[in-house]
């Protein structure tokens, strides 16, 4: 049976053709065309082509970043590799599409990519108006502001009249506007499409403030000429739950992506790592471990996968904690403590539904 798939042609921040959502919020969606396509599940499609196409950032250290040889690393990259391991038993069967914030939803809606795993904030508008589903949260964040130490500012409330740079197509534009209006401060906002353009302009001293998610500030700070000459102010002005996104209408694919993330979180809680996964799988007697590692029940079958899908994920990319520590943790250039991204049993809010 044929079905109509809406290809979203543009998602922009600002006034323009389309519709407005909420009180003055300016996320606008233009539908350029309707594509006639046969109804094929995403799982069938990726199996047919032999790989998963994953949408990532254009270069955000710790989350999705390519080295000089084109090898991608980061916690968002690990999630995509984990899905490939779940589907194919091979984490290498994934290709990466670097996308700007403005391009990302169009690429997913049109079918150019199978998963968007690109430091993307889960909001009501995005969840209910764009034909997309967020499959979970792999990093709890909040928006912050970075300034040169030479500015002398100790608080965001000292930034009246500031020139502020950020990216187009993001929640940061709306959040910073709300914050300055609520605190009765004036400001000038300039938005760039590419993150590297913002970094270069800020590094050249063309503005007073660079604002984005605090994890993003930590990542982009590593690219500055003199990182130690800049400081992230203490205020967190928003909630930014970041996570993977898929198209609506394919519950099986949504479940595969969601449960890949859940498996990584549950594995950390149960002490299953990349190094010990096989050994635990062969010796475990705890029913929860047996279910996670495919030794009991038919949980893989219910996803359309082999029963060792989660074991393959953990052996390939490790548990959530391993991924975090490798890419954004205290021993990386980002030096980010776990904070709220610690397990619920260790003072954080990270919590996955059980496999049962």
PLM-predicted stretches and their roles:
Residues 1-26:
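Single-pass membrane-anchoring alpha-helices
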Residues 30-37, 78-81, 85, 149-153, ...:
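Extended ligand-binding regions for polar small-molecule ligands
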Residues 37-117, 292, 305, 316, ...:
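Extracytoplasmic small-molecule ligand-binding "clamshell" domains
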Residues 40-43, 76-84, 102-105, 109, ...:
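Extracytoplasmic/secreted envelope proteins and their assembly/folding machinery
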Residues 47-51, 84-92, 109-113, 150, ...:
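Sec-exported extracytoplasmic/periplasmic mature domains
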Residues 51-62, 70-87, 121, 141-197, ...:
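Bilobed "Venus flytrap"/periplasmic-binding protein-like clamshell domains
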Residues 81, 85, 89-158, 214-237, ...:
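Acidic, polar ligand-binding/catalytic clefts
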Residues 326-356:
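Conserved C-terminal helix/tail region of periplasmic/extracytoplasmic solute-binding proteins
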């Amino acid at each position: 049976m044929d079905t109509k798939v809406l290809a979203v042609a543009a998602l922009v921040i600002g006034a323009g053709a389309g519709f407005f959502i909420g009180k003055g919020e300016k996320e606008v969606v233009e539908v350029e065309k309707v594509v006639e396509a046969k109804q094929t599940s995403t799982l069938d499609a990726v199996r047919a082509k032999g790989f998963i196409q994953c949408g990532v950032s254009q270069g955000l250290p710790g989350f999705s970043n390519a080295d000089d040889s084109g090898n991608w690393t980061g916690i968002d990259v690990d999630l995509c590799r984990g899905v490939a391991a779940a589907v194919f038993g091979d984490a290498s069967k994934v290709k990466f599409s670097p996308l700007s914030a403005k391009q990302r939803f169009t690429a997913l809606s049109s079918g150019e990519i199978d998963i968007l795993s690109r430091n993307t904030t889960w909001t009501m508008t995005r969840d209910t108006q764009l034909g997309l589903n967020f499959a979970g949260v792999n990093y709890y964040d909040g928006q912050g502001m970075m300034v040169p130490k030479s500015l002398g500012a100790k608080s965001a409330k000292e930034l009246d009249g500031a020139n502020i740079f950020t990216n187009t197509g993001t929640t940061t534009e709306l959040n910073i506007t709300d914050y300055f209006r609520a605190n009765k401060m004036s400001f000038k906002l300039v938005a760039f499409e590419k993150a590297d353009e913002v970094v270069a302009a800020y590094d050249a001293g063309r503005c007073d403030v660079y604002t984005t998610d605090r994890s993003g500030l930590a990542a982009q700070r590593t690219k500055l000429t003199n990182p130690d000459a800049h400081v992230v102010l203490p205020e967190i002005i928003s909630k930014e739950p970041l996570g993977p996104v898929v198209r609506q209408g394919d519950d099986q694919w949504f479940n595969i992506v969601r449960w890949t993330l859940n498996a990584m979180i549950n594995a950390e809680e149960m002490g299953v790592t990349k190094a010990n996964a096989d050994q635990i799988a062969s010796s475990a007697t705890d029913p929860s471990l047996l279910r996670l590692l495919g030794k009991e029940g038919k949980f893989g079958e219910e996803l359309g996968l082999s029963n060792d899908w989660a074991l393959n994920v953990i052996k390939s990319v490790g548990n959530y904690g391993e991924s975090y520590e490798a890419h954004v943790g205290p021993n990386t250039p980002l030096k980010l403590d776990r904070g709220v991204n610690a397990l619920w049993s260790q003072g954080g809010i990270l919590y996955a539904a059980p496999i049962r």
